[in-house]
């Protein structure tokens, strides 16, 4: 017979069909277990009674069985789709906000119980937050910054043995990260200053993670870190330096997880695209590489610079901003592998950052801070001598901060190099730092930047990071510049300094 050699699965079904038939009648198939549906009404949402029920524990013995012997039901939301989960979480968030507003009214003894007004208020606040996060509207923080008191100032919260070259903050402003020239990578708490050190794994582990070791190899030199970036979700930390690799670390465990090879020279700058796991890396080999940290994969490569790339920045869009020693700023359209070129009058652009998708800020090696717009290939506004280094015994008479004065010595010292510029994301508040003894705050206006205050800080300011709230500023400072030893300030302290900002 045709089916004699086939293995029978389960018993045969004899109800209503032919006796001994192996084919199952769909009518008698076991009905699949249906997922419990959650009702989403405008006003009422079914919620669990306790934390235990919410986590799926409703009583039973230690083996997970119910006391009455019944099998525990599956999690209520185990089979929900991604869309259903987003809807459920959104409804829960709205309910929490409505409840918070009701409590505020009760505390204020307000008898008005209009839920429609609450919903309208919540709608406006959520819309404004979304527009601020996406960069469509600008938060006006600069006008709220008050003049620092005499007691205010930078205080060192994390110490390093050598110059700090890069700092970064987590998206919630609670944790900070710093890297120095001696290869030390630190993870620290902003409020308490408690530090944790990232430990470099052995060569065998690095090799298994994708690193290509070169011989002979000086460990102290090869681990010199020059760049650092943290993902917006706080999961990954990326570092790079003279070993030509991009190293990925797990922030939760502080363990090394991946080493990306590919650059042919020192990795000089790193940044994550906000809200994603895409990482952009710039190098002295004049290329920008794009990586997917989650998938541990290389995506693409962008060219355009004719000199070493010194700084990079990115926002939400697939766009990258880079500057280099070829006196150009490049706006990379990553998916298309195209670029827009902006030329600067300075001999070298040292730093850059996005203000918005259409505006950028740059710092150069002659103490100039410039504002750029997407539609003009030259700076929209140039503030000269923003960090001019004035030698001892020389007065400032005749030196115009934003004038046409040219210093007697055209070869500006390393103290005036604007090594760092930063903005409070989505706002009109910016800062710049050099080695001339202070960090400068700026207000970004329409086609102009206006100086606010000078915050004294001794040393080369190699990196800056604003808190998202705008309530404090972090600076990576050291006795030497970011790249090389073009200057030395023995009175400076190597470390991370924090300065509180008082907002009106």
UniProtKB/Swiss-Prot annotation:
Q: Which InterPro entries match?
A: G-protein_beta_WD-40_rep, Rrp9-like, WD40/YVTN_repeat-like_dom_sf, WD40_repeat_CS, WD40_repeat_dom_sf, WD40_rpt
Ranges of compositional bias, category Basic and acidic residues: 20-33, 89-106
Q: Which GO terms describe its molecular function?
A: U3 snoRNA binding
Repeat (WD) residue spans along the chain: 159-198, 220-259, 262-301, 304-342, 344-382, 413-452, 456-496
Superkingdom of the source species? Eukaryota
Q: Does the keyword Repeat apply?
A: yes
A Gene Ontology annotation in the biological process aspect, one of them, is: rRNA processing
Location of the region described as Disordered in the Swiss-Prot/TrEMBL record = 1-120
Give yes or no: UniProt keyword Kinase: no
Q: Which Pfam families match?
A: WD40
- Regions of biased composition (Acidic residues) lie at 41-54, 70-81, 107-120
Signal peptide from the UniProt entry: none
Tissue specificity remark: Expressed in tissues with active in cell division such as shoot apexes, root tips, lateral root primordia, embryos, endosperm, pollen grains and embryo sacs.
Describe what happens without this gene: Embryonic lethality when homozygous.
Q: List the subcellular locations.
A: Nucleus, Nucleolus
- What are the UniProt keywords, alphabetically? Nucleus, Repeat, Ribonucleoprotein, RNA-binding, rRNA processing, WD repeat
GO CC terms in record: Cul4-RING E3 ubiquitin ligase complex; nucleolus; ribonucleoprotein complex
Q: In which family does this protein belong, per the annotation?
A: Belongs to the WD repeat RRP9 family.
Please name the PANTHER family in this protein's record: U3 SMALL NUCLEOLAR RNA INTERACTING PROTEIN 2, U3 SMALL NUCLEOLAR RNA-INTERACTING PROTEIN 2
Protein task = Component of a nucleolar small nuclear ribonucleoprotein particle (snoRNP) thought to participate in the processing and modification of pre-ribosomal RNA. Essential for embryogenesis. Plays a critical role in embryo sac development and gametic cell fate. Required for the correct positioning of the first division plane of zygote. May function during early embryogenesis.
Protein name (database record): U3 snoRNP-associated protein-like YAO
Q: What's the source species' lineage?
A: Eukaryota, Viridiplantae, Streptophyta, Embryophyta, Tracheophyta
